[in-house]
């Protein structure tokens, strides 16, 4: 206190600081009211269940005879190209978009130059990414999904657990889920992560093995609420 030249009595807030705090609150209240008014006009997820059934009927027919061997993250990307163009989805990845294959073709990047984007490049911030997606999912205006390697689910655990406790429905796309993958060595090769995820109450874990299972997993995941 001496170094900061703070001479106020304990538990006393100086009047000038209190004014700054209250001015900030009033300013933010106005922004909040404007945001709430704008969001009330967004259709959001009102017609989501009907959209899912119709769209996935089309997707299932499209890929019914698909039998080319490919990584399920590529199958997931093919599904995402369909659904992100038709639904209110908000996506992102923790510095692994090119590896997770989580960005739909039509999705714009959200950044300081474009606040209308539906996709965020989070950088190496798995926990922050999951926390932000929880917040967006809690608005009920968007279905959210985010991607990283399965081995990095450990970094997201607090946010994953909170999503389950809050009974919200963000989707996590965990790729490279095999000990046979990962040229970067053991840090990128998941062992115990699947068991950890399956032990979280009020959570669902799907591991598709081919194109049609990937289609089915996306459909079920989007219907969970």
Language model regions located:
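Histidine-centered active-site/metal-ligand motif
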Residues: 1-2, 7, 176, 188
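Conserved phosphoryl-transfer catalytic core
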Residues: 2-19
